[in-house]
Swiss-Prot record:
Record's comment on post-translational modification: This protein undergoes a protein self splicing that involves a post-translational excision of the intervening region (intein) followed by peptide ligation.
Source organism (scientific name): Mycolicibacterium flavescens (Mycobacterium flavescens)
GO molecular function, one term: ATP binding
Record's protein name: Protein RecA
Alphabetized UniProt keyword annotations: ATP-binding, Autocatalytic cleavage, Cytoplasm, DNA damage, DNA recombination, DNA repair, DNA-binding, Nucleotide-binding, Protein splicing, SOS response
NCBIfam families the UniProt entry points to: intein_Cterm, intein_Nterm
Gene that encodes it: recA
Superkingdom, natural source: Bacteria
Role of this protein: Can catalyze the hydrolysis of ATP in the presence of single-stranded DNA, the ATP-dependent uptake of single-stranded DNA by duplex DNA, and the ATP-dependent hybridization of homologous single-stranded DNAs. It interacts with LexA causing its activation and leading to its autocatalytic cleavage.
Length: 423
């Protein structure tokens, strides 16, 4: 099979390619002028978005039609837009997919800024276990908003947490009761976390993977947010030297299954004796630590406590805090982004189709969305004889529960399109 032509998709002249210097340029101009530029490209070996040279330019003549895509993004006007031929390959969370097989509501892979350091991500994890929350961006933008709020007596603690996230743009407001709330700019890197924690039943769901990711800093923030410490002895007797007490942490906001998983995690990972019980007239769920485990837990989290919250520690554990803000430079990383609209683009004066070839990775980004760089026609004896395109309809038929806790879905999959065609 020599000199076999393999067909791939292309883009409309005006589709904007992201260059390595973070600017954009129309793909038609890059091709017609054979611009010697570097573009952003995804390197799967390092899981990074990196600069790569354009090594070939293709003007493949008129197209019958282009599909106009609008995809959510966090910056600018909140929308990525590009026009591709129906057979161009677009990257999705499940792999490469032809543009013509995508519909509104599907998700594609897009590059978005990641701003959080490992320390800051732990602040988010710990806060979500306590008083923090993540809410979707309601303006069809990619990313979710992280919010923290505390009463007037804990404003110093809130200020301490906010300083740990000090490089993230945020706004602060105080309500009529003196409670202070801090809202951070939408962060695309937290979108998947939001979807995993909030399953729609009003309670927070923390998976085994979530719990395994926790560090002592996250546990400290959880304790400072929702924990209470009752002193049982001031340590005046030899057998209680250093004092003793018992920790209770409210877990009412968590699902029933999550409460059990958290109790087991504390026992299995940290060797803590913890039990679940109902507290007060309202019967709120709390985790109660034994006296010995209370001291052991405080020893674990003491280096990560805010100075204003050290009253929740035994005297011998106070003054150990070593926490200081750790910021990192923003980097571009891949995240899923929802398609807002797909329609056939009206004919324009120029219907020519353009593509580029990128060195090494064979992909690039059009207005932030990851696309394949294959040219419209290539030749070579290793060309595939057929291409397969399968579309499956996935429907939820049953919710799987752990007690009263929804932990998954049973689904039915039906093949609704199965196309095999020569190139």
């Amino acid at each position: 099979r020599e000199k076999i032509g393999v067909m791939f998709g292309c883009f409309n002249y005006s589709t904007r390619v992201q260059l390595a210097d973070r600017t954009t340029e129309k793909i038609g101009k890059i091709v017609t002028q054979k611009m010697d530029v570097e573009v952003l490209s995804y390197d799967p070996d390092t899981d990074r978005v990196v600069p790569r040279k354009v090594v070939n330019w293709f003007n493949n003549g008129p197209a019958e039609q282009f599909l106009q895509f609008t995809v959510e993004k966090s910056g600018g006007n909140g929308k990525s837009q590009f026009a591709a031929t129906p057979n161009h390959l677009i990257r999705t969370p499940g792999g490469w997919t032809e543009a013509g097989d995508l519909i509104a509501g599907d998700r594609v892979m897009a590059t978005e800024p990641h701003r959080l350091s490992d320390q800051q991500f732990q602040v988010v994890l710990g806060s979500l276990m306590g008083d923090g929350n993540l809410s979707p961006n309601r303006r069809d933008r990619n990313g979710v908003r992280f919010r923290m709020g505390h009463g007037a007596k804990q404003v110093d603690y809130l200020r301490w947490k906010t300083e740990l996230l000090g490089n993230i743009k945020h706004s602060t407001r105080v309500n009529d009761k003196g409670a202070t709330f801090v809202d951070f700019t939408p962060l695309p890197e937290l979108a998947e976390l939001q979807r995993a924690v909030y399953l729609g039943d009003g309670k927070k769901f923390l998976s085994e993977e979530y719990l395994k990711a926790l560090t002592p800093l996250a546990l400290a923030i959880w304790y400072m947010d929702d924990g209470a410490f009752t002193v049982r002895s001031k340590g005046l007797q030899e057998r209680t030297a250093g004092g003793s007490g018992r920790i209770e942490i409210c877990v009412e906001a968590m699902s029933e299954g999550t409460r059990v998983r958290l109790r087991d995690y504390l026992h299995d990972t940290h060797g803590l004796e913890v039990r679940l019980r109902q507290s007060g007239k309202a019967g709120k769920a709390v985790l109660v630590f034994s006296t010995a485990s209370s001291a052991k837990f405080q020893e674990l989290v003491a280096p990560y406590m805010a100075p204003s919250m050290e009253y929740k520690l035994l005297p011998r554990f106070r003054g150990q805090s070593t926490v200081s803000p750790q910021f990192v430079e923003s980097t571009q990383r891949l995240v899923p982004a929802r398609i807002l609209d797909v329609h056939v683009k009206p004919h324009t004066r120029s219907m020519n189709r353009f593509d580029i070839e990128v060195e090494g990775n064979h992909n690039y980004f059009v207005d932030g969305v990851m696309v394949h760089n294959s040219p419209e026609t290539t030749t070579g004896g290793k060309a595939l004889k057929f291409y397969a395109s399968v579309r499956m309809d996935v429907r939820r038929i049953e919710t799987l529960k752990d007690g009263x806790d929804a932990v998954g879905n049973r689904t039915r999959v039906k093949v609704v399109k199965n196309k095999v065609s020569p190139p």
